[in-house]
């Protein structure tokens, strides 16, 4: 049996956490031969800690052979001790009448503290995925608060946007989603992100040629993917939790186990490619192997695409400037 991998999950008793933990414990994220120890962080209030205890009881009751141990805590340094993987799911949701800038600042406090805790106690090669919104900027804050860790260890989740876009293309083409490759989602995990199928193929054939409808692209496809989260809240009365958890599993599984040459979208610190300033955490096409990701470089960016990329970058830079005074 392999040595257990330590996985931290924050916001562990929340909706996404509840949809995520059982799948991690069953081996869906790191492999069916990889034992895991779950290190679970929740808020210190009584209600959150009681809910966490209940979730841990349920995890025990599943008798997962791969679940080698659990820790439940309200202390980030306990949750992050010696971890290999961190899923930062917990974030302050936007309350009624709350301005976006207030939300940014509230979350900046959380992710500054969590970045510092990771810096202090996590393994030096820890893989960090930020799910809690605003995910790109929260990941940037955590990265900047962990100066002793490699910035490449910090990523933001754009896989939900990527999967949503795959599904919309599959519906449009009437073709199975599994045959679609080389889709890209550029930018921020927000309604400004840009799903781009110019390079995508379905069973090897160009999707751009098959659809060949710029009106559908600009008027239906891009806004449908961008507003999908809001549409789910409207329909369900709650935000998308199971699909977000599924995307987190996909993101980490591909990062750790490899994407087998397939392009996937990850929010990663820019190296200056595609005119994105260095260090900005931005959705890019990547391939992954041996626990490392590599940017897909030198894709041509046409005027239509540049407009969308500029817009999502402007939003990210605005978010970054809103929290820069907290980062020294």
UniProtKB/Swiss-Prot annotation:
Binding site for substrate: 94, 100, 133, 164
Keyword Isomerase attached: no
Positions of transmembrane segments: none
GO biological process: malate metabolic process; NADH metabolic process; oxaloacetate metabolic process; tricarboxylic acid cycle
Keyword Oxidoreductase: yes
Keywords assigned: NAD, Oxidoreductase, Tricarboxylic acid cycle
Residues annotated as the enzyme's active site: 189
Pfam families, A to Z: Ldh_1_C, Ldh_1_N
Protein EC: 1.1.1.37
Catalytic activity from the UniProt record: (S)-malate + NAD(+) = oxaloacetate + NADH + H(+)
GO function term, MF aspect, one: L-malate dehydrogenase (NAD+) activity
Annotated residues for binding of NAD(+): 11-17, 107, 114, 131-133
Domain of life assignment: Bacteria
Family as reported in the entry's similarity comment: Belongs to the LDH/MDH superfamily. MDH type 2 family.
Function of the protein: Catalyzes the reversible oxidation of malate to oxaloacetate.
Annotated protein name in UniProt: Malate dehydrogenase
Species of the source: Xanthomonas campestris pv. campestris (strain ATCC 33913 / DSM 3586 / NCPPB 528 / LMG 568 / P 25)
């Amino acid at each position: 049996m392999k040595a257990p991998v330590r996985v931290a999950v924050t916001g562990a008793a929340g909706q996404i956490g509840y949809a995520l933990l059982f799948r991690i414990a069953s081996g869906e994220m790191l492999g069916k031969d990889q034992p895991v120890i779950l290190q679970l962080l929740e808020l210190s209030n009584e209600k959150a800690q009681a809910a966490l205890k209940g979730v841990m009881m349920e995890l025990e009751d599943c008798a997962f052979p791969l679940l080698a141990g659990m820790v439940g805590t309200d202390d980030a340094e306990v949750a992050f001790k010696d971890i290999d993987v961190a899923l930062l799911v917990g974030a302050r949701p936007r309350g009624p009448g709350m301005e976006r800038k207030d939300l940014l600042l509230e979350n900046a406090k959380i992710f500054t503290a969590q970045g510092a805790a990771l810096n202090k106690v996590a393994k030096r090669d820890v893989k960090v995925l930020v799910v809690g919104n605003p995910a790109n900027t929260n990941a940037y804050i955590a990265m900047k608060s962990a100066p002793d860790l490699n910035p490449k260890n910090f990523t933001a989740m754009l896989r939900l946007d990527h999967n949503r876009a795959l599904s919309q293309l599959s519906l449009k083409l009437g073709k199975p989603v599994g045959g679609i490759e080389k889709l890209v989602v550029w930018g921020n995990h927000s309604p400004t992100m840009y799903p781009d199928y110019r390079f995508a193929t379905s069973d090897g054939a160009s999707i751009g040629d098959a659809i060949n409808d710029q009106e559908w692209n600009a008027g239906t496809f891009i806004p449908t993917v961008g507003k999908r989260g809001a549409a789910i809240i409207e329909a369900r009365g709650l935000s998308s939790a199971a699909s977000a958890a599924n995307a987190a599993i996909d993101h980490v599984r591909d990062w750790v186990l490899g994407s087998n040459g397939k392009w996937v979208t990850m929010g990663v610190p820019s190296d200056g490619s595609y005119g994105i300033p260095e260090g900005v955490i931005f959705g890019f096409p990547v391939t992954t192997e041996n626990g490392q990701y590599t940017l897909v470089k030198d894709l041509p960016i046409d005027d239509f695409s540049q407009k969308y990329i500029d817009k999502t970058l402007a939003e990210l830079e605005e978010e970054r400037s809103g929290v820069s005074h907290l980062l020294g």
